[in-house]
């Protein structure tokens, strides 16, 4: 269906000025001013906020403005003039404006349609896809002055469920009062929850069981209908879910490739072995080429003349699959041919990202390439970067990762 947009232009006056400092009290003052100046909306709206280029000053107001606007039921994205481009002066570039507007679309859970991308014949494309994600080192801004380590939550699990055919996006987290929220509702909830005194205690309580309860619930939920779990394998998720490590996988008894009799779920405290073969829930482990030495940076093919040629799509290498996006059609990617950021700080650069997929749990009748192909396709459905075909992570994980923008923290999650 078509998207209808109503635009209203307003001046934010001095709300966009730099704050006196960067303390929690400074943020609270600006949040209160936003609450007093901007009428609360009955429904969730988006606000694209244009700010002055104040990159060399202290007291950046963006985090406070985002929290204040969230309290008025508004999602926010900011536009500032190009920091390093002297030609821009006080005018932001068209690409920056375009990107900010499209990111507001993403914050509402908008994705591109998948049905026009040869997905009809792939049974995986009807499945709900659940991105399993964990934020780490969550220290709320209100704890900035304290030296106590107990005021930092080590991690917080969160889940985003996405169905490409319906376009529906739902978020779940143990911090929410409701079982699930729409994606924009979850962003606003995270903003408010991270400012509460019990935020760290609640994060620690939610994190205690790792992913065990959620995985068992998903196994039962998808007894007859198709579901697909995507989990990005890194140091944090391996600690929470030992069963996704290469060491654990090598010890599984396989009915056939990618169909283990049982898998390990949980961490050292809650680890247990469970069978998922009687469920229609599949699980795929992902590893990013840009973030681990275990995965190559890139893959290419050799043509009949023995020359290297560009590769894109999904390729199988032994028991893993590599997903490679098509070459981005943008100047940033072409800049990377012969230049680097160190020598050209004004220029922007881009690169293709290789993603490794390992089907941790499939059903015996499944074609692994169909399920991996669908997971890789989900990288191409996000709207906020129109100059390239794919983002780094499939849509549910991409959406889950970016929910952290609404936490009001000392430092963003790593």
Stretch-by-stretch model annotation:
Residues 1-414:
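Long, contiguous domain-sized segments
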């Amino acid at each position: 269906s078509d998207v209808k947009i109503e635009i209203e232009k307003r001046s934010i006056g001095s709300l966009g000025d730099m704050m006196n400092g960067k303390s929690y009290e400074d943020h609270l003052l600006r949040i209160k001013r936003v609450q007093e100046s901007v009428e609360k909306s009955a429904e969730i709206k988006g606000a694209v906020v244009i700010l002055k280029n104040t990159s060399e000053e202290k007291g950046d107001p963006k985090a406070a403005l985002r929290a204040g606007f969230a309290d008025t039921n508004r999602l926010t994205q900011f536009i500032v003039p190009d920091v390093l481009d002297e030609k821009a002066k006080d005018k932001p570039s068209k690409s920056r404006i375009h990107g900010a507007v499209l990111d507001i679309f993403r914050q509402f859970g908008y994705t591109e349609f998948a049905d026009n991308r040869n997905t009809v014949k792939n049974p995986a494309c009807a499945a709900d896809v659940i991105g399993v994600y964990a934020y780490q080192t969550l220290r709320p801004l209100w704890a900035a002055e304290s030296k106590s380590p107990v005021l930092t939550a080590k991690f917080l699990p969160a889940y985003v469920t996405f169905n490409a055919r319906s376009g529906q996006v739902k978020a779940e987290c143990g911090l929410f009062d409701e079982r699930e929220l729409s994606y924009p509702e979850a962003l606003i909830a995270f903003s408010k929850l991270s400012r509460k005194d019990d935020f760290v205690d609640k994060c620690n309580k939610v994190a205690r069981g790792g992913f065990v309860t959620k995985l068992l619930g998903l196994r039962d939920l998808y007894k007859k209908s198709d579901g697909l779990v995507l989990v990005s394998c890194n140091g944090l998720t391996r600690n929470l879910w030992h069963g996704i490590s290469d060491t654990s996988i090598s010890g599984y008894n396989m009915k056939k490739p990618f169909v283990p009799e049982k898998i390990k779920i949980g961490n050292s405290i809650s680890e247990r072995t469970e069978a998922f073969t009687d469920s229609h829930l599949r699980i795929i482990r992902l590893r990013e080429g840009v973030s681990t030495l275990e995965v190559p940076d890139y893959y290419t093919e050799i043509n009949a003349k023995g020359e290297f040629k560009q590769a894109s799509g999904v390729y199988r290498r032994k028991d893993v699959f590599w997903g490679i996006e098509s070459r981005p059609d943008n100047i940033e990617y072409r800049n990377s041919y012969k230049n680097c950021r160190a020598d050209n700080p004004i220029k922007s650069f881009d690169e293709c990202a290789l993603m490794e997929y390992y089907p941790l749990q499939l059903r015996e009748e499944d074609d692994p390439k169909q399920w991996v192909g669908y997971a890789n396709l989900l990288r191409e459905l996000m709207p906020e970067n129109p100059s390239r075909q794919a983002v780094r992570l499939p849509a549910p994980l991409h959406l889950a990762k970016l929910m952290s923008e609404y936490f009001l923290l000392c430092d963003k999650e790593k």
